[in-house]
Structures are given as structure tokens and as C-alpha cells.
Amino acid sequence: MRLGVNIDHVAVLREARRVNDPDILQALYVACNSGADQITIHLREDRRHIQDSDVTNIMRHSSVPVNLECSINKEILNIIAQEKPHRATLVPEKREEVTTEGGLDLFSYEEDIGYAIELLHDSIIPVSLFVDPSIEMMEKAKDLGAEMVELHTGTFANLFAMLHSSLPHSDHSVKEYELPRYELSSRLEKSLEDLKNAAIHADKLGLEVAAGHGLNYHNVDQILQISEIVELNIGQSIVARSVFTGLADAVKEMKRLTSR
């Protein structure tokens, strides 16, 4: 299993005080030296964390492949095309969101996504699409010419947290999942089945399959049971763990878990 370490949240901490601390390049070096198979970053339209200069510097200095997440905004796409990352992952994006809230709607934005894929392919950049786990999305991703899909694991992660952590008793409880435990268990099982079925179908179509969003040290084991998934992109939980253990140990522990 490849581990993509997303270092966006290192930049979130830096931007909170508008200083160059923590240094994103130091985070890059530590992650690479601690077992990351890939570095993932998201250049958002609002530049709330990763900046254009970060992309250039990370591309220049990374010793492992760089997966660059981006929206289908043409200005952003042109930057990606110039930087030529090892892969571009197209994701949905809304300015008011705290984090990416769902998968890319390949049907509603088919024309724009098709344009984005063509532009990136013209620059010899493979494309992954961040999508919800459904058979229809897998088939549409294949039709659009993507090489890979990244399955959105947010629903699974939220259900797992509401069932197996203190999240329901916190200020950040997920209101739509404030349900009886038997209902949460049923929905969690269904979310895993959706992920498994989507991964199997994508694999049969010849698409590489990644997964990400909300994955952490407690829930990742269940995703590892889906053999068709070959890559996990994990960020916030690693950076959160690093506050207490240091980034090197946080990456090493996640690498150990995902290598089983």
C-alpha cells in the first residue's frame, strides 16, 4: 500500500500567523525520510494554506512523487500544467467549506472536467478524480479518460468516529449522524460495502484506485481490507499526531499501519 502524506495542515499552521514557521520544506524532508511514498498537497483557489511558491519548491525538492490536488478552475489548471507534478487529482472546491465535503460530480461538470483532463494530458500529467464511491462514478471516470480514482472516504470516517470515538459528545458532532448505535453500525457497514464495490469495479475497468479523507490511525485498518485500493492519502490525522509525537514518528507509525 502506498502512503501519500498530505502536508497541507503544516501550511495551515504557518498561515495562521503569516510566518515561515513551520517550514513546509522541513515537513517535506521529514515526511520523505520517514516513509512517505508520495507527498500530496492541495493548491486551493483561495490559497488558504499551500501557496504557489510552495508548489514550486516542493516539486523542486521532493525525493518522492508529488500528487497535486486542484479544482477545475482554469487559472489553477494552468499552474498545475506548468509545474508538471507526478499526478494531478481533481477535487471539488467551495470557498466556504472547512475541508473538501464530497466527491467531484462527474456528471454535472462533465464538460469542465473533460477540458481539465485534456489540458493536463497535453502536459503529460496523469489524472486522478476524487469521487464518491459509486459504480456510476467509476464508469464515468473511465469514460472521461482518467487514469485513477481516489475514493472519498469521508462518509465512512464520520460514521466510524460517531460510533467509535468521543466525537458525538464534542462541539464537532456530525448532526446528521446523531443516530442510535445500531443505525450507525448499519450505515458504517453500508459505507464500507460501497467503497469495496466501487474499488472492485474501478479495478476491473483498468483504473488505479486510491482512497482518502478522514482516514486516521484508528479507522485505516478497515480500508486496508479492500485489496483493490493501492494508495491512501492521509494528512490531518498525521499532522495532529505530530503535535504530540513529532512528525517523523507520526509518519512512521502510519506507514507501519498501512504496510500490514
Task: Describe each region flagged by the PLM.
Residues 48-74, 108-128, 173-210, 254-259:
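Alpha-helix-loop-beta-strand connector modules within alpha/beta enzyme cores
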Residues 1-69, 74-75, 79-85, 143, ...:
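Conserved N-terminal beta1-alpha1 strand-loop-helix module at the mouth
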Residues 132-192, 198-201:
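Histidine/lysine/aspartate-rich catalytic loop segments that bind and position anionic ligands
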Residues 90-97, 148-161, 228-247:
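Glycine-rich phosphate-binding active-site loops on the catalytic face of alpha/beta enzymes
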Residues 3-7, 39-41, 66-68, 88-90, ...:
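Hydrophobic faces of well-ordered beta-strands that scaffold small-molecule active sites
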Residues 73-84, 134-144, 211, 215-229:
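Catalytic cores of alpha/beta
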Residues 59, 102, 163-176, 184, ...:
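C-terminal helical cap(s) of enzyme catalytic domains, especially alpha/beta-barrels
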Residues 6-24, 65-72, 99-107, 124-133, ...:
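Active-site mouth loops of central-metabolism enzymes
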